[in-house]
């Protein structure tokens, strides 16, 4: 059940913005002398968890009142509030293009002095650095939870047939053929919802393309056509093992079909598991890394910062904000989130992961992960729709057309950013 919001619409937020400013804005003190710290976080599915965190924190802290809002359309609400200069103290968002834009707009505080960063896995801190449009000194977010994407599979069916986890592209294709020969459906897709086209695309690209490819393109060092051909061809190749007309079925349809045993595998992220389990609570799910290369040593887990916390640059109560972050990073609080959301912790520690991540555990523990390529794509470019169009195109030159369009559209939607990056490189010729 979603939390009953204190302010349920952007209009309501705007109506109260003036009053909030009158109360001296970010981190306003209350009549009882407490400092109020407000968090706005973007995952409404975790609202109940954050309600509990808020209650636990406030029951154990006499000098700080914590308010956590989990609105349904948090990014729109946050952007509206930023325009009105009505800032929360802390925001909880994903490590994606929105984070890059907020950072580029100088909205976030450098928290390099926050001691809690010492407990965060370097891999996820490095992922945030790759989201910077140009290199910046400092640290601007605390990675909290990651997710993982590859291939979910029905463990019971695998065990029944004696199938083993593929570690190369050829082994994956051979497995799919074995599944078909057994009269079963290898994959199910919900490509009617265009965003789901990014799931296999991202999982394949982390093996075959540089993690900083978008930055390389912005610097004029390469093109997508030079790097994405194999990614595109292998994403298309998965259709050979999909159900008939995967573009007629939605994400919900695919989750339901997999839950009911209509397919043995589902190329999607760990975020799909709760919905699958709603349909079939008894399904025995595990997962494995997408083996897009024929060199098993090159396999990388597709994992990014699903939730991270940034202190706003104008927060007046940095010490209290850090105290809230300390509470969020307590082992008990972290484990509670893992249990609630089947997440991957960005914090070092001996945490118990969901069983459906067993097949990815070694990659998580070794930090052998790479971020989602689409975290660098501007939303207005609609890469998901471009991929869907490509997958529907059965012409001989479909891949060439797609790759040419990708490069053209990238320049169209990133013209100002490309100019900024290249100006920076001219001013800093020694920066790699």
Q: What kind of feature is each model-predicted range?
A:
Residues 56, 60-124, 156, 160-161, ...:
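Extracytoplasmic "Venus flytrap"/periplasmic binding protein-like
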Residues 80-81, 88-89, 118-156, 185-189, ...:
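A structural signal for short loop-to-beta-strand junctions that line the ligand-binding cleft
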Residues 134-144, 149, 173-220, 263:
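Extracytoplasmic/periplasmic solute-binding protein
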Residues 94-149, 173, 179, 200-202, ...:
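Hinge/lid segment of periplasmic solute-binding proteins
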Residues 56, 107-110, 271-275, 307-381, ...:
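Mature extracytoplasmic/periplasmic domains
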Residues 59, 161, 233, 240, ...:
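Extracytoplasmic/periplasmic substrate-recognition and gating elements
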Residues 159, 335, 366-432:
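Conserved C-terminal helix/tail region of periplasmic/extracytoplasmic solute-binding proteins
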Residues 178, 217-247:
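Glycine-centered hinge/linker elements that transmit conformational signals in sensory
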């Amino acid at each position: 059940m979603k939390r009953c919001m204190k302010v349920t619409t952007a209009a309501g937020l705007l109506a109260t913005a003036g009053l909030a400013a009158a109360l001296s804005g970010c981190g306003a003190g209350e009549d009882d002398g407490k400092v109020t710290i407000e968090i706005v976080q973007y995952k409404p599915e975790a609202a109940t968890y954050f309600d509990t965190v808020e209650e636990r924190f406030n029951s154990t802290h006499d000098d700080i009142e914590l308010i956590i809002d989990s609105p349904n359309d948090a990014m729109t609400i946050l952007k509206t509030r930023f325009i009105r200069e009505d800032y929360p103290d802390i925001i909880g968002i994903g490590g994606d293009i929105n984070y890059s834009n907020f950072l580029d707009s100088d909205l976030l505080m450098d928290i390099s002095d926050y001691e809690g960063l010492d407990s965060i896995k370097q891999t996820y801190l490095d992922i945030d650095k790759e989201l910077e449009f140009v290199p910046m000194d400092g640290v601007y977010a605390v990675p909290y939870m990651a997710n993982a994407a590859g291939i979910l599979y029905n463990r019971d069916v695998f065990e029944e047939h004696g199938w083993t986890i593929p570690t190369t592209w050829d082994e994956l294709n051979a497995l799919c053929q074995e599944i078909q020969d057994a009269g079963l459906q290898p994959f199910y897709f919900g490509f009617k919802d265009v965003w789901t086209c990014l799931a296999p695309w991202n999982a394949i690209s982390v093996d075959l393309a540089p993690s900083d490819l978008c930055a390389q393109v912005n610097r004029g060092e390469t093109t997508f056509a030079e790097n994405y051909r194999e990614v595109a061809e292998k994403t298309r190749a998965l259709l050979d093992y999909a159900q008939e007309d995967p573009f007629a079925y939605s994400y919900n349809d695919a989750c339901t079909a997999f839950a009911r045993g209509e397919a043995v595998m589902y190329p999607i992220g760990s975020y799909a598991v709760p919905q699958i389990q709603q349909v079939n609570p008894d399904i025995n799910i595990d997962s494995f890394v997408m083996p897009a290369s024929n060199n098993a040593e090159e396999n990388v887990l597709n994992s990014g910062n699903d939730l991270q916390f940034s202190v706003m640059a104008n927060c007046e109560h940095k010490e209290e904000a850090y105290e809230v972050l300390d509470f969020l990073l307590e082992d008990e609080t972290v484990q509670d989130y893992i249990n609630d959301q089947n997440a991957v912790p960005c914090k070092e520690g001996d945490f118990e992961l969901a069983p459906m991540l067993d097949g990815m555990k070694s990659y998580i523990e070794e930090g052998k992960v790479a971020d989602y390529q689409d975290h660098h794509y501007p939303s207005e470019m609609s890469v998901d729709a471009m991929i869907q169009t490509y997958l529907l195109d059965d012409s001989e030159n479909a891949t060439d057309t797609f790759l040419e369009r990708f490069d053209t559209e990238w320049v169209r939607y990133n013209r100002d950013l490309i100019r900024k990056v290249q100006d920076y490189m001219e001013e800093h010729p020694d920066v790699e």
